[in-house]
């Protein structure tokens, strides 16, 4: 599988993931790009699960973002509805983490759209390791969100055999006005 982690701290939202693609117990590729920008660069999305399935979901999600003019929550809810009700989509085995300046969400194939309670959220085989590390670093260090994502993904890669150290990290800087509204 893989590990995708997002951290929201200060004026940063960061999503990162490793690059390992496995087929069973065999590493097929080590530098896949599982985190990418969508909707004019305003949204960052990362996937864990089947690569082909994830690309299908990226396309569908980007379509929903266009339909809802970049409104992340509406697009996520509509994707989750489609994913749950469409026979072909229901068979897709992947999960998405999506984030913009206002929200961070996880979207699952069972129709769940969840916003994290804490500043970190992770999916994939190494997700629990990465999220635990990130939460500890958020609470106990002055590291930036990007530094936390990098360190946490490396910890997950040290523990999880389906996660490697080839990282893709994307970040969004939150405007001061938006940051004030969220407090």
Curated annotation (Swiss-Prot):
The keyword Protease applies. GO terms for molecular function: metal ion binding; threonine-type endopeptidase activity. Allosterically activated by HslU binding. It comes from the Bacteria. Coiled coil: none annotated. SUPFAM superfamilies: N-terminal nucleophile aminohydrolases (Ntn hydrolases). It is found in: Cytoplasm. One of its GO terms (cellular component) is proteasome core complex. Its EC number is 3.4.25.2. The keyword Protease applies. Disulfide bonds: none annotated. The active site is at residue 2. Na(+) binds at residues 157, 160, 163. One of its GO terms (biological process) is proteolysis involved in protein catabolic process. It catalyses: ATP-dependent cleavage of peptide bonds with broad specificity. Keywords: Allosteric enzyme, Cytoplasm, Hydrolase, Metal-binding, Protease, Sodium, Threonine protease. Protease subunit of a proteasome-like degradation complex believed to be a general protein degrading machinery. Belongs to the peptidase T1B family. HslV subfamily. A double ring-shaped homohexamer of HslV is capped on each side by a ring-shaped HslU homohexamer. The assembly of the HslU/HslV complex is dependent on binding of ATP. This is ATP-dependent protease subunit HslV.
